[in-house]
Amino acid sequence: MGRFSNIITSNKWDEKQNNIGEQSMQELPEDQIEHEMEAIDPSNKTTPYSIDEKQYNTKKKHGSLQGGAIADVNSITNSLTRLQVVSHETDINEDEEEAHYEDKHVKRALKQRHIGMIALGGTIGTGLFVGISTPLSNAGPVGSLIAYIFMGTIVYFVTQSLGEMATFIPVTSSITVFSKRFLSPAFGVSNGYMYWFNWAITYAVEVSVIGQVIEYWTDKVPLAAWIAIFWVIITLMNFFPVKVYGEFEFWVASVKVLAIMGYLIYALIIVCGGSHQGPIGFRYWRNPGAWGPGIISSDKSEGRFLGWVSSLINAAFTYQGTELVGITAGEAANPRKTVPRAINKVVFRIVLFYIMSLFFIGLLVPYNDSRLSASSAVIASSPFVISIQNAGTYALPDIFNAVVLITVVSAANSNVYVGSRVLYSLARTGNAPKQFGYVTRQGVPYLGVVCTAALGLLAFLVVNNNANTAFNWLINISTLAGLCAWLFISLAHIRFMQALKHRGISRDDLPFKAKLMPYGAYYAAFFVTVIIFIQGFQAFCPFKVSEFFTSYISLILLAVVFIGCQIYYKCRFIWKLEDIDIDSDRREIEAIIWEDDEPKNLWEKFWAAVA
């Protein structure tokens, strides 16, 4: 999709190289030697013609450095060995090793339509099609709707923050990289491991649901068998090149989008009287009511409030993955163009897919429907399917349940993809074993895939009589880890904006400027922090060790890793503004000329508008 533009093209550089090559450096006066070296030393970052070693290796690999310039630089370096002139690296073996390591990158093979559709529907899965049953039964249609709207505002600002940073510095697993650069190494490493833990656990959740969705049709095959089969299939899928992942997610996400849009039209018809039930309208908001029974407390108002608070946790789990575009930025072609487009569609995704879907579900399914709170299994079927069954539309429930199955498989596939890229990023920055930075010829971090998939085997926990309890444990652990990532995104963006101001850089000059900032970042950081600490309130009513452990285990692990990093790195709690790095990786992207990928026909224009 692009090519490296020639960084060293100045005639002044070539002329200086040739002059020095013609004259022996020993014959030059000492002051002239110092002057010449200051002008041409590649390690001197103050000269406009200098390049760092990473760029040099890249240029050397692509053959875009002029042969004479390379020879002259080597000649000068060798002739001045006695003067002990030190560059970034002078050891030939280390240079060759670095050049070899530079080849081991993930590939920028995701196009605009891939990024857009992944951001639009890539991680829509269990949280939406299955997980909304719990908040609906606890908080009722109105309570759950308010919870999802409130959480949606937080997610919007989080993605805006991430979009501004990821467009300016598009790197793989930018969520963890930004925490390390703009906050401190301890924040970055702890956030990285927790974010990986989040997606690995979410993979277990998704795989555990697949078999139970299939049980809608038959229960003759053991649940454990379905879990094993799809665990193997999804894990193997992640060994294909990222382009295959992009194509798969593009078409599956397209099915999700079309299915949800079709459901919304269908639901509107049923609400208006298009079934044997007659016009439904707000019938179920009047009886059994707009607010659910609540939880824990016998006091109606208090119980409903607690039910609403618990719905926030389910909403957070449902929205997880909206920030996925920040992970794909490092594998996106022309990220300065593709990432902003995807970010700007987040609000459309929140309103259409989540808010509108929950609104119609609340109209068509009463909160006291027994199928919403089945205790023998996590789900008997999706609330979407229940609403279709209530309308008496034959065959359509089976079709939509098949859509749910495809959706959950897609979401599970994205879980492994994200987790493997997080481990890859940690390895590339020296914060994980270097083996996790190894990739196949197609750019797949295979050890990251294996490690992430291994934790997905926790899905077998649901194969017992306490399946519902195990399922909720996995959701709580995953959700809290995801909330911590959102918090770090907001905090990193706050420091990023402060660093820009410190350098005198206007945000108006950025490739993408987040809306309503910095207020949106402070808003998201504050409420995410509150939710992190109150989300486990049920463990205290009364106090239960097992529930406390599952509610706060992610927070405990985060604290342990953070403190360990502080001790190991002996770093400041947070970087000084003048020490914040906003240049690394950015210059490399700016040196690339991307091909124009504008839509050329009606079909491409349609997908550009949708994705």
From Swiss-Prot:
Q: Which GO terms describe its molecular function?
A: amino acid transmembrane transporter activity; basic amino acid transmembrane transporter activity
Q: Which residues lie on this side of the membrane: Extracellular?
A: 137-141, 206-223, 275-303, 366-398, 465-473, 533-547
Which regions face the Cytoplasmic side of the membrane?
Answer: 1-115, 163-185, 244-256, 322-344, 419-445, 495-513, 567-611
Instruction: Say if the entry is tagged with keyword Glycoprotein.
Output: no
PROSITE patterns cross-referenced by the UniProt entry: AMINO_ACID_PERMEASE_1
Query: Where in or outside the cell is it found?
Result: Membrane
Q: Which residues carry this modification: Phosphoserine?
A: 64, 75, 79, 87
Q: Which domain of life is it from?
A: Eukaryota
In this UniProt entry, the residues modified to Phosphothreonine are 77, 90
- Describe its membrane topology: Multi-pass membrane protein
Q: Which Pfam families would you find in this protein's record?
A: AA_permease
Q: InterPro entries this protein is in?
A: AA-permease/SLC12A_dom, Amino_acid_permease_CS, Amino_acid_permease_fungi, APC_YAT
Give a GO biological-process term: amino acid transmembrane transport
UniProt entry keywords in alphabetical sequence: Amino-acid transport, Isopeptide bond, Membrane, Phosphoprotein, Transmembrane, Transmembrane helix, Transport, Ubl conjugation
Transmembrane region(s): 116-136, 142-162, 186-205, 224-243, 257-274, 304-321, 345-365, 399-418, 446-464, 474-494, 514-532, 548-566
Q: Does Membrane appear among the keywords?
A: yes
User: Location of the Glycyl lysine isopeptide (Lys-Gly) (interchain with G-Cter in ubiquitin) covalent cross-link?
Assistant: 54
Q: Which GO terms describe its cellular component?
A: eisosome; membrane; mitochondrion
| Misc note | Present with 2580 molecules/cell in log phase SD medium.
Of which family is this protein a member?
A: Belongs to the amino acid-polyamine-organocation (APC) superfamily. YAT (TC 2.A.3.10) family.
Per its database record, what is this protein's job? High-affinity permease for lysine.
What's this protein's name? Lysine-specific permease
Lineage of source species:
Eukaryota, Fungi, Dikarya, Ascomycota, Saccharomycotina
